[in-house]
Amino acid sequence: MEKEKSICFSLKRVNHIVERGIHTSLAAAGFDEITNMHGWILGFLYHAQRPVYQKDIESNFGIARSTVTNILQLMEKKGYLTRTTDEHDARFKRLELTELGKKVHLDTIAVIDSAHDNMEAVITYEERRICFEVLEKICKNVEKITGGE
């Protein structure tokens, strides 16, 4: 008898396939140099309601300081963001999107939204609702078991 499929394995597989599909869509639209993390950081900065510093990126995404430094240096070199000295504390550098960074964010989001729409076109509203309900149930259970948030 065949062993029952693992939900965790299926989630990992779907995640990999979706990320690969989005990367392919982005590359076809000319955004092949945008990494997933660059995209997340662009979005974080774009939607920020307050000044953002490197420490915010480190804590929000759970990334080491040295890694964030390298990512931000590359993003600054590509012209997506600037680091300016905070007017209240010269030790801190405020991160701000450039006009290019804003444009890249909006353009990549349009490509990603279109890719999501195409991927989800095969499921009904009810299937989508049930999927979210089941995933949320699994998340809450894992958090309960592991003591996570």
Language-model segments: which ranges?
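Short capping segments at the starts of secondary-structure elements
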Residues: 48-53
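Short, locally clustered residues in the helix-turn-helix/winged-helix DNA-binding domain
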Residues: 43-47, 109, 136
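Short alpha-helical elements of helix-turn-helix
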Residues: 8-9, 33-43, 66
